[in-house]
Amino acid sequence: MFKLKYFILLICIATSFAACKKAELYSPAAQFTADTTAIRAFITANSIPAIKDSYGVFYQILEPGSGSFSYSGTTKVTVDYQGRLLNGTVFDDSNGTPRTFTLGGLILGWQIGIPYIQKGGKIRLLIPSYYGYGERAAGSIPANSILDFTITLTNVM
């Protein structure tokens, strides 16, 4: 009985120390570096002629569209799109029914990428998690996910 008390005390002390262990901290810079490395490997493996912009978003203009619209946060964009994870899993799709959004209300990756095209244009965006949903999960999108979007801009106003 006496040994059992010491054993239980030892378990309690060990549990207390384990509970005090510091959680691993999230590092946006380290995650961004990891995302960039993964995107570069993906575009190389899939022969995608993507360009990396100054923010770190990779894009491929499939069709530039026409016009000379100047975008702002209040710009309304009507888009047909499909969103995928790098493993090919589709997490969102407008299914040929264009949807209208305010540009400033969209994820940063879209705010950065959509202005590269004009009405009628089509773009592929490979978005590091920092410019997507970051360290939080969103629906079927896991935390720290790189996003792969193909977007057709059907209207802009």
What annotation goes with each model-predicted range?
Residues 2-6, 16-157:
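Cross-family detector of peptidyl-prolyl cis-trans isomerase
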